[in-house]
C-alpha cells in the first residue's frame, strides 16, 4: 500500500515505477468496481476546481465523471472563467482556490504554471495537460496496454510515430523509461525531441532497464513493436505556414495498415490520445481536405477503424485512471 495522500500529480518524472504501478492497480480496481456496482466513495464532501485554459472533451469528462462517481463536487473554470496570468498571477490564483477547494486540476499552457499552482495552493494539484507534458494520458495508455497484452509493461516495445517534439512524445518517453519499456520515437530529424529530456530519460533507462531510441527511419523504428502510437501533427490556432511545413514533413509518417504490417507483429495495436484527423467528418477535416488535399492526416481511416485500433478503450480509461489519481492523492484511506 502506498500513501500518496496530498501529493501533486504534475509529471510521471516525480513518481517511482512502484508508485506508477499503484496508480494503475487502483485504476483497474476502480474500473472493476464501477462495472460491478460496488464502488466505494472516497471523495465524499470534497470540492475540486477544474481549470481549463484549453478546451477539452476527454480530460474534462474524465475529471467530472470520476469526481461525481466518488462523491466530490466540481467547479469548472473554462478559458473565459479564470484570470491566470491575465488579471491574477498563478501564485495568487493558487492561494485563493487552495482556501476554497480540496484539489485543483489545471489544463493549459506552460508546465511552469501548473508547478506554480502546486507550490502555492496547499492542496493537491493535478496536471490535465500542459505544452510540455500530459501525465494523466500516460496512465490511461498504460492501463490499456496492460488490458490488451498478456505481458508486463517492461516487456512492451512501443513506438511513438510523428511529431517528436510535442507533449505526447515527451510524456510517453518519461512514462516508458520509468516502466522499463523499449521505447522509440520515430520522427523526422527536422522535428527534434527535447535533447535535455532525452538525456534525462536515458539516465533513468539505465536504472530501469528501459531502452530509448530516436530515429527518422520508419522501418527500423517500428520493427517488432507491440504498440504504434501517434498524435495530431498540428494544434488548433497554429499559423498556416506551420501546418504546411509539418504536413510536408510528416505525411510519410502517417500510421497506416502498411506500417502495422512493418512491425512484423500480428498482435500489434494502434493507439492515439484523440481527437484524430482520420476522415473528413469534422469541420477541421473538411478544411484540411480543401487546403492540403488530404482526407486523413496522422492515421489512416482504415487503421483507425480496424481491429488493431484500441483508441476507444484508451479513451474510456482516461476516466478510470484520473479517478485513481484523485482517490490516491485526495481520498479517504
From Swiss-Prot:
Alphabetic keyword roster: Arginine metabolism, Cytoplasm, Transferase
InterPro entries: Asp/Orn_carbamoyltranf_P-bd, Asp/Orn_carbamoylTrfase, Asp/Orn_carbamoylTrfase_sf, Asp_carbamoyltransf_Asp/Orn-bd, Orn/put_carbamltrans, OTCase_ArgI
An annotated GO BP: arginine catabolic process to ornithine
Domain of life: Bacteria
The keyword Cell wall biogenesis/degradation is assigned to this record: no
Pathway: Amino-acid degradation; L-arginine degradation via ADI pathway; carbamoyl phosphate from L-arginine: step 2/2
Residues reported to bind L-ornithine: 167, 231, 235-236
EC number assigned by the record: 2.1.3.3
GO molecular function: amino acid binding; ornithine carbamoyltransferase activity
Subcellular location(s) per record: Cytoplasm
Database matches in SUPFAM superfamilies: Aspartate/ornithine carbamoyltransferase
PROSITE patterns for the chain: CARBAMOYLTRANSFERASE
Keyword Disulfide bond tagged: no
One GO cellular component, as annotated: cytoplasm
Matches recorded under HAMAP family: OTCase (MF_01109)
Main function: Reversibly catalyzes the transfer of the carbamoyl group from carbamoyl phosphate (CP) to the N(epsilon) atom of ornithine (ORN) to produce L-citrulline.
Listed name of the protein: Ornithine carbamoyltransferase
Species lineage: Bacteria, Bacillati, Bacillota, Clostridia, Eubacteriales
Gene name as annotated: arcB
